[in-house]
């Protein structure tokens, strides 16, 4: 690889590393309705409930894979759909949010901060909140 190519890759990597905290801090700030610097489960579920309503374009009270637009992979969708009807109702969707929230809260303090949101578990939760 040329020196120019390496320079471009290094610059890109630095940019991505530098922006990771910004998006997670921004999301926490958006969801943190009590302004304590963290997101608790109630705040996460409130945001997820609003997103559910926004994604439910046909207003049938469920989300199918098309409406979820890649926010949930096939394996997680199947697990979150215990009645196997091919859709998630709001309770099933919020149960998935709670499961991902708990996975993103390794210290079990009931809140997620920007650092926890940047973890793999936090990154899987984020698309269900915004």
PLM features per residue range, with description:
Residues 32-36, 56-60, 81-85, 105-109, ...:
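Acidic carboxylate motifs that coordinate Ca2+ or other divalent cations, activating on Asp/Glu
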Residues 1-10:
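Bacterial N-terminal signal peptides that target proteins for export
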Residues 60-103:
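Mid-chain, structured segments of secreted extracytoplasmic proteins
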Residues 30, 53-54, 79, 102-103, ...:
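Short beta-strand elements of solenoid repeat domains
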Residues 120-130:
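Short, low-complexity, Pro/Ser/Thr/Gly-rich segments in the mature regions of secreted, periplasmic
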Residues 10-19:
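Bacterial N-terminal signal peptides
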Residues 33, 38-45, 62-69, 89-94, ...:
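Carboxylate-dense, calcium-coordinating segments in secreted/extracellular and ER-lumen proteins
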